[in-house]
Regions:
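Short, hydrophobic/aromatic-rich beta-strand segments within well-structured domains
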Residues: 30-36, 101-102, 196-198, 227
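Histidine-centered nuclease catalytic patch
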Residues: 47, 52, 198-227
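Aromatic- and Lys/Arg-enriched surface recognition patch
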Residues: 48-126
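Compositionally biased, charged N-terminal/linker segments
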Residues: 1-28, 35-41, 107-108, 113-122, ...
Length: 227
């Protein structure tokens, strides 16, 4: 958190897990909140869930760089190995793969803007939890998140049933947020079955994503404009 906050506006973040054994499942572009553990017990920001993908750690670094929350690929690998050692990792997935929760439209809060975590969050719980953002503690936390960001931060986002924050936040829309370059690359790679569109090459180190209509020529930064 502190490293990403020091980088300024990050736009997209790869919230990785040291193991790719269990996929993270949520509605596309639903809110994903960052919660600090004890003694802070606070919400320090949020992003919108773009997708989950199991990736080699080097590809995660190549696609997202310091948006992985580390200043270098070497430090990222050291952190992965340290966490795996602490948790007694014995994964069935390829050893170099990590679980990547890819987030866009990320907003991080300064300490003075941290939000009190849900009052019904179980003590010592370290696993993700889902909340109805239309009522109760879910509604309070999400409302306070929106109060801390510019009105246009998620203006192009349809969070739909994932938030249901009420009429005063406007009716749900179907326009999705722009993907960052890393999220675009992973989205296109997965859309083509991790294979080259021309040669059917499946070697990830030689694959890259490109725009059909160049982004500089107002081509959309979306999966259907990629190959």
């Amino acid at each position: 958190y502190r490293f990403l906050l020091s980088q300024g506006a990050v736009g997209e973040v790869n919230f990785w897990r040291p193991s790719a054994a269990r996929a993270f499942v949520a509605p596309r572009f639903s809110p994903f909140l960052f919660k600090l553990k004890a003694p802070h017990n606070a919400i320090c920001g949020f992003g919108l869930f773009a997708r989950y993908s199991a990736l080699p750690y080097w590809l995660a670094w190549d696609a997202f760089g310091t948006s992985n929350g580390c200043p270098s690929q070497h430090e990222m690998l050291e952190r992965i190995e340290a966490i795996r050692k602490r948790m007694g990792f014995r994964g069935a997935a390829p050893a170099d793969h990590i679980g990547c929760i890819i987030l866009v439209s990320v907003a991080l809060f300064q300490q003075g803007d941290w939000i009190r975590q849900p009052s019904n969050w179980p003590p010592r719980n370290l696993t993700p939890m889902g909340y109805d953002l239309a009522e109760g503690e879910g509604e309070r936390v999400w409302r306070e998140c929106l109060e801390r960001v510019p009105a246009d931060t998620i203006r192009d986002t349809d969070v739909g049933d994932a938030s249901r924050t009420g009429a005063r936040f406007g009716a749900p829309r179907t326009v999705i947020p722009r993907l960052g370059q890393g999220a675009f690359r992973v989205d296109v790679t997965e859309a083509y079955g991790r294979a080259c569109a021309m040669t059917d090459e499946h070697s990830l180190p030689v694959l890259d994503a490109a725009h059909i209509r160049p982004y500089a020529s107002e081509g959309p930064h979306t999966t259907n404009n990629g190959l």
